[in-house]
Amino acid sequence: LKKNKKMIAHHVLFWLKADMTEEQKTAFRKSLDTLQFIDVVKFFHVGTPAPIERAVVDTSYTFSLLLVFEDLAAHDVYQVHPLHKAFLDEFRAFFDKVTIYDAH
C-alpha cells in the first residue's frame, strides 16, 4: 500500500467494560472483522496490545482497529456505511472508552 497525500489513517483504540464475558469479547472481535468488507477500506488491521514493555507504549486498551482510506471522502462513506452503523448499534454499550486518531 503506497501512501498518497490524500490517504486517511483511522486508528481506533477500544477499552471494553471490565465485566464483559469472553463470549461478548469474541462477538465484539467478530463484528470488528466485518468492517474489512466495506469497499472503501484499503487497509485493515485488528489487534490486541503487543507484549512490548516500554514506558512510551500504551497497552491498556482491549482492541485496536486500524483502517486506511483513499481520501477523506472514503472515510466519510465508511462512517455512514450500514456495517459500521450496525457495529456501533450493537456494541457501543460495551465501550468503557474509545480514542480515535485520524491522520493524513
Stretches found by the model and what they are:
Residues 1-62, 70-77, 104:
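Short S/T/G/P-rich N-terminal loop/turn motif that feeds into the first structured element of a domain
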Residues 41-46, 90-102:
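Conserved short beta-strand edge segments in small beta-sheet-based binding/regulatory domains
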Residues 66-68, 72-98:
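C-terminal structural segments of small proteins and small subunits
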